Amino acid sequence: MPKQADYTWGAKKNLDTIACLPEDVKQFKDLLYAMYGFTATEEEPTSEVHPGAILKGTVVDISKDFVVVDVGLKSEGVIPMSEFIDSSEGLTVGAEVEVYLDQTEDDEGKVVLSREKATRQRQWEYILAHCEEGSIVKGQITRKVKGGLIVDIGMEAFLPGSQIDNKKIKNLDDYVGKVCEFKILKINVDRRNVVVSRRELLEAERISKKAELIEQITIGERRKGIVKNITDFGVFLDLDGIDGLLHITDMTWKRIRHPSEMVELNQELEVIILSVDKEKGRVALGLKQKEHNPWEDIEKKYPPGKRVRGKIVKLLPYGAFIEIEEGIEGLIHVSEMSWVKNIVDPNEVVNKGDEVEVVVLSIQKDEGKISLGLKQTKHNPWDNIEEKYPIGLRVTAEIKNLTNYGAFVELEPGIEGLIHISDMSWIKKVSHPSELFKKGNTVEAVILSVDKESKKITLGVKQLTPNPWDEIEVMFPVGSDISGVVTKITAFGAFVELQNGIEGLIHVSELSEKPFAKIEDVLSIGDKVSAKVIKLDPDHKKVSLSIKEFLVHGGDAGHDAEEESSDRD
């Protein structure tokens, strides 16, 4: 425990009372007198006195401005009256006083004495004898200096700016003249200075008071506090020496964006103690708990399926929050805004401030959540979609979008269907829908399937006409002769377009009996050729043709093709 110094600030100690000090201090005094040329018993100066010694002298004269003191040297010393200011009223001729020997003689041969330096010396000796680092002393703040304040604790001590207070300081001048207790932080013997702190005592007092208050606080009680800080997540209140946090979620039952919407600095609030952590010294406060909780009977008041009206108070990418009564908000998710449109942004349907009617979908009381639906207030066109668009129905629709895998068409506002790329042509291999369709055009198609649950409709264009491959064996029986136009030449053969757009392949081995280096030596794209059907594969939509077979069986056209080829050679 730091010792409490029995010291009165600002008083210039009567050095003559040194004999009343405790025994150990007397011994210390005797040592000092020996150092300064005094005898330990008589306390009289020795024959050899040096500057810096403290001497005992007698007042021989007093004037308005000066005091003349005889210390037993060859001349008397003249000391300014200002150095006796604290004891001038009791100062009389013949009184004994302690003085500091500045010089044994000046330029005029006179002794130079100082009462003030003697007083400071005795004060320093007293500090060394009675105080240590950690001691508590009382003092008065006398003036402002660079970096802090000066405190009179019987001698001047330095109070750094960081040690003045435990709160933010606006003006150092406000502290000048105050009488306070201070803790000695450092005593520098070599430099004869003392550093003190007021902040450490205030902080210790605060911690002690906080611990005491923590023990007194009970959960559920009401207390008044002053708003000392406002943050994004809540408000800190001073509860008469202890800080408590009023979280933004405990300020009101309704939604607020920032605590400053409800409170301001230095405002007094009555709050309820929600929780106390004595180990960490934390107190959680509540303001909304003083009012009725509108969520208590929420399930009875707003059962699922009930229609309610409310105001849009907030829009987020995933939905809109609607206030259905003060303190009660629900969410309309984007998926619950339209039966037929894929809503990406709530602004497509509603705006902040709109009054809307919604349907309660579900309630999560413990989490304070209500799910609402906007589309549920309107008829769902998918309810009777199967009756409206039966399979096999022919429809005309506008092409809304083309993708790599198909074309989307709008059957009615909000109801779209897909024509898959595989349902566009019986015979043509379509690489992209843009080969057949253009966005914005209308197209006739057949309903192929309706999935009510997944909200999907598929359509087909090729289904408008019979599948020619179903009649392929009748149209092109094996062994029959056909004619067509060469549309494509590959390394393995030539493709020929036949009747109804069906393609047949003349393999390279079936082109000619005569040897040739490459197919282009025999055929070119655009050539009209005759060939014989040698094989059909309806499942894989393949027709195999042969010019060789056609020629072997005496087909004139086949000969003409070879002759044309010979002419090119």
Swiss-Prot record:
Top-rank taxon: Bacteria
NCBIfam families assigned: PRK06299.1-3, rpsA
A GO MF label: mRNA binding
InterPro entries (alphabetical): NA-bd_OB-fold (IPR012340), Ribos_protein_bS1-like (IPR050437), Ribosomal_bS1 (IPR000110), Ribosomal_protein_S1-like (IPR035104), S1_domain (IPR003029)
One GO-annotated biological process of the protein: translation
Pfam families linked to this entry: S1
Domain S1 motif residues, every copy: 52-116, 134-199, 220-288, 305-375, 392-462, 479-548
Lineage of source species: Bacteria, Pseudomonadati, Chlamydiota, Chlamydiia, Chlamydiales
GO cellular component: cytosolic small ribosomal subunit
SMART domains xref list: S1 (SM00316)
Name this protein carries in UniProt: Small ribosomal subunit protein bS1
UniProt record similarity statement: Belongs to the bacterial ribosomal protein bS1 family.
Disulfide bonds: none
Functional summary from the UniProt entry: Binds mRNA; thus facilitating recognition of the initiation point. It is needed to translate mRNA with a short Shine-Dalgarno (SD) purine-rich sequence.
Keyword field: Repeat, Ribonucleoprotein, Ribosomal protein, RNA-binding
